[in-house]
């Protein structure tokens, strides 16, 4: 399975307890539904994806914790911190209108209402309140644009661009 076939769904975070559990930092809005996928794909950024069996997933407090096959204790869990979690696109539901997987936004050009190119989406950040587009300009300056309707006017995937209300000098 290549990186292009995998949609990144989240990232493993800190260990939870001493029996191999990890906090899951999801990039989506329904991580409990991931329990339906017995096989996850995991990788560190820039490394090849590999299969990993999910042993358990549960809500805990305001978050989600997971137990993966082969992660038996806290030491093993500590070594998994930062690992990306993904799934093959065909295993995921299709998105509704104005819903997007983050991976579909990465690489799109960002154009403002004055038809000025702000840059290219290189990643996203989840802040809790909303997602934030990481946009790298041609000047190698990274700009952070909130992914909210007041800023993002249209996502035109077929045209390869996102239209925004944002000044080129902001």
Swiss-Prot record:
SUPFAM superfamilies the record matches: PRC-barrel domain, Translation proteins
Classification via Pfam families: PRC_RimM, RimM
Chief place where the protein resides: cytoplasm
Example GO biological process: ribosomal small subunit biogenesis
PRC barrel domain: residues covered: 97-170
Alphabetic keyword roster: Chaperone, Cytoplasm, Ribosome biogenesis, rRNA processing
Keyword Repeat: no
One example GO MF annotation: ribosome binding
Subcellular location: Cytoplasm
Alphabetized InterPro entries for the sequence: PRC_barrel-like_sf, PRC_RimM, RimM, RimM_N, RimM_N_sf, Transl_B-barrel_sf
Cellular component, GO annotation: cytoplasm; ribosome
Domain free text: The PRC barrel domain binds ribosomal protein uS19.
Subunit note: Binds ribosomal protein uS19.
Main function: An accessory protein needed during the final step in the assembly of 30S ribosomal subunit, possibly for assembly of the head region. Essential for efficient processing of 16S rRNA. May be needed both before and after RbfA during the maturation of 16S rRNA. It has affinity for free ribosomal 30S subunits but not for 70S ribosomes.
Xref: NCBIfam families: 16S_RimM (TIGR02273)
Family: Belongs to the RimM family.
Name of the protein this chain belongs to: Ribosome maturation factor RimM
Organism (species): Dechloromonas aromatica (strain RCB)
Taxonomy of the source species: Bacteria, Pseudomonadati, Pseudomonadota, Betaproteobacteria, Rhodocyclales
């Amino acid at each position: 399975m290549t990186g292009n076939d995998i949609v990144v769904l989240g990232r493993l975070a800190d260990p939870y307890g001493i029996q191999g559990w990890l906090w899951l930092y999801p990039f989506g809005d329904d991580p409990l539904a991931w329990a339906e996928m017995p096989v996850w794909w995991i990788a560190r950024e820039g490394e090849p994806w590999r299969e990993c069996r999910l042993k358990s997933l549960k809500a805990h407090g305001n978050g989600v914790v997971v137990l993966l096959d082969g992660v038996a204790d806290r030491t093993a869990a500590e070594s998994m911190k930062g690992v990306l979690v993904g799934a093959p696109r065909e295993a995921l539901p299709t998105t509704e209108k104005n819903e997007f997987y983050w991976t579909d936004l990465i690489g799109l050009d960002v154009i403002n209402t004055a038809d000025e190119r702000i840059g290219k989406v290189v990643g996203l950040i989840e802040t809790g309140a909303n997602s934030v587009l990481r946009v790298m300009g041609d000047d190698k300056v990274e700009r952070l644009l909130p992914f909210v309707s007041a800023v993002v006017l249209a996502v035109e995937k077929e045209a390869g661009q996102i239209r925004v209300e944002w000044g080129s000098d902001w």
